[in-house]
Amino acid sequence: MPKSPLPARLTGLTCTLALTLAAPALATGIEPPSEEVLAEQMAEFLTDAPGSIFAMNPFRAEQTVTGEDGLQVQLISTNPVINTWFVLRVEEADARRPSFYHLENTDPEVWHISLGGDGDDPFILIEGDDDAEECAPWAGRSPELEEAGDTGLPYAPLCDGRLYLRNRVSGSRTNREAIAEFLRDNVIFGDSIVNLIKGTFYEDAFLEDSDEIEEADAGAVVEALGQANLSRFPVMNASPGFDLVGAEGGMEAGSWYAVEDAPGIYSSVMQPGMISDEILNRSGETNWLDGVERNANVYLVAFDMSQFELGYELGTDHPSFGWSSRPSGAGRDWSIPGPDGFNSPAPLVMNGMLSPALLDRVAATFTGGYKRDHGAWRFGPMATYNNGHHYGFLVNGTLLSRLWPGLATIYVLDDGTFGMTTWTEEMNELLPRLRFARQNGVALINPDPETGEGVPGDLVTSWGGGNWSGSADAQLRTLRAGSCLREVDGRQFLLYAYFSTATPSGMARTFQAYGCDYAMLMDMNSQEHTYMALYPQIDDDDWIEAEHLVSGMANVDQNSRRGAIPRFVGFADNRDFFYLLRRE
């Protein structure tokens, strides 16, 4: 099968970007690329293997200034529309090679970044509505960039806290202990972990106050969510690791319960064998469920997306950028180091941790999708073209691995719009506006083209064709997690589900029973890979406490003398993850 025609997929994208960059929000900061430069960058991107992280981002904007002493400074915005990630290139006149630094804008809605001082003393210019800051972190006897790099922190502050230097750190368990020791040795415990990290290491510049937003009545939302389509509704002893409102005597299967001290978050529990015969007996959609799967507990969490923003970060190691071992033959080009022509994101840095500027708003985190080695096809048509369809991903407006048509995709746009769908060629026109995206396999549930009802995807019953993978001993039924999008009366809900053991068929039937419009697989095989935690709002608590969907997930967090430091928010991790922030 031939490769997808890249130019056809991106027709009109240059014009789309030109209109987007002309918006008033980009009146300051680096000048957008000219039409000529944009066309050159797009041509580079449209090759089968762009070959570098810069070539993968055709909407990037660059600015270069030169000092009177020969110092050359270049600033690259990977996506001016999103205004979050920058690469700083510094080359002294007598240097053997330039130095590169990955910078992150701590508040993209406020700060616009550019360079000044051309022909004199170069500096970074950081402009806000009523403020401007000039800084040259490469200058002086003890350059701020060197000091920030020596901290060993995943995010080190620069320029009075307006920028972060993203540092390379390890996401291993050994490094978690090292970070915990660093915290113990350098901090007097007695504040919350949020203040510990933000106040002591990142200074008060990162503390933010959020106005309260109008919250829907929990009872009304529970009523709107309704009950799952089950044949029976027994009260179950099983329950998630959250404190729930009204569940003191147990949880009724298929019903929703508000999570205590976590507005906008709800939980449910069931077993696939309880699903109504109306769904289970529909022929030709899924495989039959065996007795083990029918009686296995499923724990679900629903997020009212009117109250949350969704984000995504890569881990320090996963997903990686080289080839999966799965594609072969026509699905693999041995002449290039990875499916996009590179096997490293350098000079960008993936650090597996939530930005400290977002800690006071974080409501939940959960692990992302497959590692790169599992995230491509070994069998079926998808294995034979488009380099085996390695799952794509995009962070902070920066495309890190190409998004392929036909793959299940979670995405967020620049205006906060959240979606979950099968990616299409036409959707590539959204690329300049994408803030986050993650692909993982194919649809478990997608809308029926005639009725709009959520029905199992075409490849749910195909083990190889759907790239569903399995347990260590190649069993299709194993511990799995998935997510779904459901819309109720114009209100979007993101559902995350933990299946103690399930096949794709059992997952699809469960999401059908809960009325999902679209659903996709996340990760599988261990509680570490299916980790999910909430962070309730408790005013008098001096820690950021994590409550886990399943109690065993707490073992992944880092223990300290004052309590557990949660994964993804308190230390770097080697796996990618999603996070939900309370809207400001």
Language-model-detected regions and their locations in the chain:
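Bacterial N-terminal signal peptides that target proteins for export
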Residues: 2-14
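Non-catalytic N-terminal targeting/anchoring module and adjacent flexible stem/linker
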Residues: 7, 24-26
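Bacterial N-terminal signal peptides
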Residues: 12-22
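Zymogen propeptides
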Residues: 27-399
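Aspartyl protease catalytic domain
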Residues: 314, 319-500, 504-512
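Conserved hydrophobic/aromatic beta-strand scaffold that supports enzyme active sites
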Residues: 300-302, 409, 482, 577
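Extended C-terminal subregions enriched in glycine
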Residues: 431, 444-445, 455-458, 468-584
